[in-house]
Amino acid sequence: MAPQNMPAVSIDINMFWQIINFLILMFFFKKYFQKPIAKVLDARKEKIANDLKQAEIDKEMAAKANGEAQGIVKSAKTEANEMLLRAEKKADERKETILKEANTQREKMLKSAEVEIEKMKEQARKELQLEVTDLAVKLAEKMINEKVDAKIGANLLDQFIGEVGEEK
């Protein structure tokens, strides 16, 4: 039970003045600070929104740049592979050309050697023919000088053939 002298609800005078001061403070705050603070908050909100938009744009640009970079890398790899294939093809063509030139030169050398061999054979035939002719003349001279009978003529002929065989 409450004491009899005291009212059931009591308001302290200090509390009353604190409420009045608070209301006055709220009035001044609303009148002088609400608009500048609202402007600062709106500016901050707008800046954050712009930063988010810019971040999204930057992200899209980075993704686009990454895609372009990958395309460039892929293109460079393709071009490098094509260059490598062209270089290999040129090397193969050069190899074939060198082989053909070597074969052609070899064929020329073989033909030249064959021609030279034929010339040497012909020269040897001519020399042999001259020697045979010379020997035949010598044989005929011997036969005439000795007045040969048939037996001696056969022996001289065999001897002549033996000499020709040895000289070859």
From Swiss-Prot:
Keywords: ATP synthesis, Cell inner membrane, Cell membrane, CF(0), Hydrogen ion transport, Ion transport, Membrane, Sodium, Sodium transport, Transmembrane, Transmembrane helix, Transport. It is a single-pass membrane protein. GO terms for biological process: sodium ion transport. GO terms for molecular function: proton-transporting ATP synthase activity, rotational mechanism; proton-transporting ATPase activity, rotational mechanism. The chain crosses the membrane at residues 9-29. InterPro entries: ATP_synth_B-like_membr_sf, ATP_synth_b/b'su_bac/chlpt, ATP_synth_F0_bsu_bac, ATP_synthase_B_chain. GO terms for cellular component: plasma membrane; proton-transporting ATP synthase complex. CDD domains: ATP-synt_Fo_b. It is found in: Cell inner membrane. Gene3D superfamilies: F1F0 ATP synthase subunit B, membrane domain. SUPFAM superfamilies: F1F0 ATP synthase subunit B, membrane domain (SSF81573). F-type ATPases have 2 components, F(1) - the catalytic core - and F(0) - the membrane proton channel. F(1) has five subunits: alpha(3), beta(3), gamma(1), delta(1), epsilon(1). F(0) has three main subunits: a(1), b(2) and c(10-14). The alpha and beta chains form an alternating ring which encloses part of the gamma chain. F(1) is attached to F(0) by a central stalk formed by the gamma and epsilon chains, while a peripheral stalk is formed by the delta and b chains. F(1)F(0) ATP synthase produces ATP from ADP in the presence of a proton or sodium gradient. F-type ATPases consist of two structural domains, F(1) containing the extramembraneous catalytic core and F(0) containing the membrane proton channel, linked together by a central stalk and a peripheral stalk. During catalysis, ATP synthesis in the catalytic domain of F(1) is coupled via a rotary mechanism of the central stalk subunits to proton translocation. Belongs to the ATPase B chain family. The ATPase of P.modestum is of special interest because it uses sodium ions instead of protons as the physiological coupling ion. PANTHER family: ATP SYNTHASE SUBUNIT B, ATP SYNTHASE SUBUNIT B', CHLOROPLASTIC. HAMAP family: ATP_synth_b_bprime. This is ATP synthase subunit b, sodium ion specific. The gene is atpF.
